[in-house]
């Protein structure tokens, strides 16, 4: 049995291939000194991420979530906005989180 806390934390996940493609486009078309967010822009709760891993790994074991415990540095919501990089060069993530996790699991 897996026991986890702080399951309601929300994050933005991006596949490494999407990141690499975005980085290359940014290096090629980006404006020096400007900042660009390479992110999915999709809010994903930790609980959902764990369920995707369980599904991909075909795990039946339960996950117990403890009280929502957080640390002083643990932001409850952290999701980026990729509008600027999209407007610059049309970059948008192409790989769904579930597909990224499935690919990761197959590599194990």
PLM segments and residue spans:
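Short, flexible, glycine-rich and Lys/Arg-enriched loop motifs at helix boundaries
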Residues: 1-7
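C-terminal "lid/loop" region of Rossmann-like NAD(P)-dependent oxidoreductases
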Residues: 6, 35-36, 44-51, 58-77
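Generic structural signal for alpha-helix termini and adjacent loop/cap motifs
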Residues: 26-30, 88, 107
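Residue-level signal for the nucleotide or nucleotide-sugar donor/cofactor binding architecture
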Residues: 8-17, 41-44, 73, 77-80, ...
């Amino acid at each position: 049995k897996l026991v986890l806390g702080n399951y309601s934390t929300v994050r933005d996940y991006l596949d490494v291939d999407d990141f690499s493609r975005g980085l290359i486009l940014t290096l090629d078309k980006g404006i020096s000194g400007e900042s660009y967010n390479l992110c999915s822009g999709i809010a994903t709760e930790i609980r959902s991420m764990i369920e995707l891993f369980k599904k991909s790994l075909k795990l039946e074991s339960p996950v117990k979530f403890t009280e929502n415990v957080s640390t002083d540095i643990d932001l409850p919501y952290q999701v980026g906005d990729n509008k600027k990089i999209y407007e610059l060069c049309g970059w948008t993530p192409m790989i769904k989180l579930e597909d990224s996790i499935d690919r990761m699991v197959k590599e194990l």
